[in-house]
């Protein structure tokens, strides 16, 4: 049984976090293991999202645990996106080759 949590985006445009849903489904299917008779594996995948410095830095984290007897083969995976100031935008203008 897989479970995922995604916070709602405050923005109306497409949010890159929505692209992580296929990744969660892949992890859920890949991490599925056959359970012993009378028991079931409990998979839990959570996504946390955090914005620091306004919209300048975005952090995603995926953590998962598979509750089985013995050693826990859990995982932690993180993505960090930082926006950099590339300086003032300079207009390029139309391509002169296309004007012909």
Curated annotation (Swiss-Prot):
Residues carrying covalently attached carbohydrate according to the record: 46
Keywords from the UniProt entry: Fusion of virus membrane with host cell membrane, Fusion of virus membrane with host membrane, Glycoprotein, Host-virus interaction, Membrane, Signal, Viral attachment to host cell, Viral penetration into host cytoplasm, Virion, Virus entry into host cell
Gene Ontology CC entries for this record: membrane; virion membrane
GO biological process terms, semicolon-separated: fusion of virus membrane with host plasma membrane; symbiont entry into host cell; virion attachment to host cell
Signal peptide: 1-34
Location of this chain's protein in the cell: Virion membrane
SUPFAM superfamilies reported in the protein's UniProt record: ENV polyprotein, receptor-binding domain
InterPro entries reported for this sequence: FMuLV_rcpt-bd
General remark: This protein is synthesized as a Env-vMpl chimeric protein. The sequence shown here corresponds to the Env homolog fragment of the chimera. The Env homolog part of the chimera has an internal deletion compared to other retroviruses Env sequences.
Official protein name in the record: Envelope glycoprotein
Protein species of origin: Myeloproliferative leukemia virus (MpLV)
Gene giving rise to this polypeptide: env
């Amino acid at each position: 049984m897989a479970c995922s949590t995604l916070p709602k985006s405050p923005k109306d445009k497409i949010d890159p976090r929505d692209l992580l849903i296929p990744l969660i489904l892949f992890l859920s299917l890949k991490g599925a293991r056959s359970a012993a008779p009378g028991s079931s594996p409990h998979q839990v995948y959570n996504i946390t999202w955090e914005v620091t410095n306004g919209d300048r830095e975005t952090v995603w984290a995926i953590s998962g645990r598979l509750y089985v007897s013995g050693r826990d083969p859990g995982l932690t995976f993180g993505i960090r996106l930082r926006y950099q100031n590339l300086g003032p935008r300079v207009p390029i203008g139309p391509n002169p080759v296309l004007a012909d």
